[in-house]
């Protein structure tokens, strides 16, 4: 790939940060340490590139990131004037943690990742950063950390997984989650239940639908912080290896031209990122994370920006969880660049935004494949959308005075009025499914699991999957002050602000109350008289904190509400 920059170029030192340590004669101990890690005399004048991966053995999304990081380090070291230094940070496997209390740590991990990238690179004076994330919170954590440092940076996505297969049926991670509901209702045999579990995940790569990881990877490529095709190159592919091999030249180009995240991550670039999320039918988590990423670079993005763009942006991608296809299928028809090329042609994107290639978004995709709407139905044209407007809707009302996020594909309708069934937490809901407490026409209310109440705002993938598997996905709605996985589908509303423990009305809902959700007029309301609400509020007792020490307690104390991205550094 060719890298360039159209702006004014001035001669700069590539090692302008690391020279603080490598060139200062009053730092002999520092320089002795460098010799200790194998530096040669000529290495002290080189720009240091920190290569951070979220590699660990315990997650298919991340198990190969160390290998990718090593390839990137080799690419950097083969590039004149650069030296690569690998480091690592943590991750949480959402697929493993979902459904249990460990899921409270997932969103927290985004902040830990950002903090550790900032901490390591800030202390070590790296001149540039390359991040290699895999699972959901890895991506925004990486971008937030790089934005805070504001040094030349590139994100290399670990890549999507291939589909699994059992008895001729294609599987993915959500197949395993939904099998639980089928098991509870007796709609799957023990043998097939085990067969789905054994075959849903065939190996390396992030969960394969348009779930949170793939959504954010596509958004970040569109934002301009990844090389073209990064988000749709499969984890196990020659294309992903080739991408790693290009990073040395790419990061040197950014260093030479002093192109920083603040030059790339503009208001218009974030609008592009939101647009691709809508077009691809992406995860509700994109709302939370794009707001947080923008905050880190000093750009104001709010929930209302999502609604504004949703109002004029159709859903064109037929991807799981609500559609048919996986991201590996998108790769076969030209990947995200082919989609961007089409959207630019139709005037849906800002084409003049700068990217990590040193070129604009429009220049990056000029040679991408053209989408052929005759030979494939993975992506539809604007005149034949899956949904005429965006699937992510921001709802307000007495149940969500600070807003909430609904994921409405259109298949489940756009209006729901039903009877509340209240659950204080995820396990309470699962118990309710198993006991037959939920029926058609009910609105499940899962509360006290917000950023503070959770703490950590865990995802409700297990409940929504159980609802689908039990055959109630089209006849029940679910609302929560928690989050949803990118794998969630159905009539669902999350991110309710204020959350229950912060005085939100969701904390006062009782069984048999009437709840109305209107995705046409963007409202969510509890149909209970004001005097009755006042009586309940007077008698309300706030639950005791679930965490009083450690990282969960710190998060609960520092976090902003979901409407502000749950950031912790304001």
Curated annotation (Swiss-Prot):
Its cofactor is [2Fe-2S] cluster; Mg(2+). One of its GO terms (biological process) is isoleucine biosynthetic process. Pathway: Amino-acid biosynthesis; L-isoleucine biosynthesis; L-isoleucine from 2-oxobutanoate: step 3/4; Amino-acid biosynthesis; L-valine biosynthesis; L-valine from pyruvate: step 3/4. Its EC number is 4.2.1.9. Mg(2+) binds at residues 94, 136-137, 459. [2Fe-2S] cluster binds at residues 61, 135, 207. The active site is at 485 (proton acceptor). GO terms for molecular function: 2 iron, 2 sulfur cluster binding; dihydroxy-acid dehydratase activity; magnesium ion binding. Binds 1 [2Fe-2S] cluster per subunit. This cluster acts as a Lewis acid cofactor. It catalyses: (2R)-2,3-dihydroxy-3-methylbutanoate = 3-methyl-2-oxobutanoate + H2O; (2R,3R)-2,3-dihydroxy-3-methylpentanoate = (S)-3-methyl-2-oxopentanoate + H2O. The modification N6-carboxylysine is found at residue 137. InterPro entries: DHAD_IlvD/Edd (IPR050165), Dihydro-acid_dehy_C (IPR042096), DihydroxyA_deHydtase (IPR004404), DiOHA_6PGluconate_deHydtase_CS (IPR020558), ILV_EDD_C (IPR056740), ILV_EDD_N (IPR000581), IlvD/EDD_N (IPR037237). SUPFAM superfamilies: IlvD/EDD N-terminal domain-like, LeuD/IlvD-like. Keywords: 2Fe-2S, Amino-acid biosynthesis, Branched-chain amino acid biosynthesis, Iron, Iron-sulfur, Lyase, Magnesium, Metal-binding. Disulfide bonds: none annotated. Functions in the biosynthesis of branched-chain amino acids. Catalyzes the dehydration of (2R,3R)-2,3-dihydroxy-3-methylpentanoate (2,3-dihydroxy-3-methylvalerate) into 2-oxo-3-methylpentanoate (2-oxo-3-methylvalerate) and of (2R)-2,3-dihydroxy-3-methylbutanoate (2,3-dihydroxyisovalerate) into 2-oxo-3-methylbutanoate (2-oxoisovalerate), the penultimate precursor to L-isoleucine and L-valine, respectively. Homodimer. Belongs to the IlvD/Edd family. HAMAP family: IlvD. This is Dihydroxy-acid dehydratase. It comes from Lactococcus lactis subsp. cremoris (strain MG1363).
């Amino acid at each position: 790939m060719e890298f360039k920059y159209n702006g004014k170029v001035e001669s700069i030192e590539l090692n302008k940060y690391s020279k603080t340590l490598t060139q200062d004669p009053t730092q002999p101990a520092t320089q002795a340490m460098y010799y200790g890690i194998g530096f040669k005399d000529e290495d002290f004048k080189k720009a240091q590139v920190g290569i951070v991966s979220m590699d660990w053995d315990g997650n298919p999304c991340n198990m190969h990131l160390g290998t990718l990081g090593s390839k990137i380090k080799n690419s950097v070291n083969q590039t004149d004037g650069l030296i690569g230094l690998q480091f690592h940070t943590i991750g949480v496997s959402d697929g493993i943690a979902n459904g249990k209390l460990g899921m409270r740590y997932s969103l927290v991990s985004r902040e830990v990742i950002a903090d550790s990238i900032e901490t390591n690179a800030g202390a070590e004076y790296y001149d540039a950063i390359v991040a290699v994330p895999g699972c959901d919170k890895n991506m925004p954590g990486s971008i937030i950390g790089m934005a805070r440092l504001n040094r030349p940076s590139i994100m290399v996505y670990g890549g999507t997984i291939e589909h699994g297969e059992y008895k001729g049926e294609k599987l993915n991670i959500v197949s395993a989650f939904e099998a639980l509901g089928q098991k509870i209702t007796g709609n799957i045999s023990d043998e097939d239940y085990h067969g789905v579990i054994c075959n849903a995940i065939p190996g390396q790569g992030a969960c394969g639908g348009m779930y949170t990881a793939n959504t954010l990877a596509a958004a970040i490529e569109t934002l301009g912080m990844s090389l073209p095709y990064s988000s749709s190159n499969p984890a196990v592919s020659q294309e992903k290896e080739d991408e790693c091999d290009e990073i040395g030249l790419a990061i040197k180009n950014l260093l030479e031209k002093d192109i920083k995240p603040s030059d790339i991550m503009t208001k218009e670039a974030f609008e592009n990122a939101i647009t691709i999320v809508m077009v691809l039918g992406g995860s509700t988590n994109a709302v939370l994370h794009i707001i947080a990423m923008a905050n880190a670079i000093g750009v104001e993005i709010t929930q209302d920006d999502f609604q504004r763009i949703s109002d004029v942006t159709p859903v064109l991608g037929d991807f799981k969880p609500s559609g048919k296809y996986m991201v590996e299928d998108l790769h076969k028809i030209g990947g995200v660049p082919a989609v961007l090329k089409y959207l630019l042609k139709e005037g849906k994107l800002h084409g003049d935004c700068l990217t990590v290639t040193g070129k604009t978004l429009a220049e990056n995709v000029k040679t991408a494949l053209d989408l052929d709407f005759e030979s494939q139905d993975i992506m539809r044209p604007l005149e034949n959308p899956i949904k005429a407007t965006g699937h992510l809707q921001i709802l307000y009302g007495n149940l969500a005075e600070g807003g909430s996020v609904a994921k409405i594909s259109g298949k489940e309708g756009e209006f729901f009025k039903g009877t509340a069934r209240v659950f204080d937490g995820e396990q309470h809901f699962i118990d309710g499914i198993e006991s037959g407490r939920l029926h058609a026409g009910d609105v499940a209310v899962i509360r006290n699991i917000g950023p503070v109440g959770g703490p950590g705002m865990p995802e409700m993938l297990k409940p929504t999957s159980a609802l689908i598997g039990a055959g109630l996905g089209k006849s029940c709605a679910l609302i929560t002050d928690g989050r949803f996985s990118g794998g969630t589908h159905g009539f669902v509303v999350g991110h309710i602000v204020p959350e229950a423990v912060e005085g939100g009305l969701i904390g006062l809902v009782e069984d048999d109350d009437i709840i109305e959700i209107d995705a046409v007029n963007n409202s969510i309301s509890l149909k209970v008289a004001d005097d009755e609400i006042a009586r309940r509020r007077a008698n309300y007792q706030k639950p005791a904190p679930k965490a009083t020490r450690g990282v969960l307690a710190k998060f609960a104390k520092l976090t902003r509400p979901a409407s502000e991205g749950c950031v912790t550094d304001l």
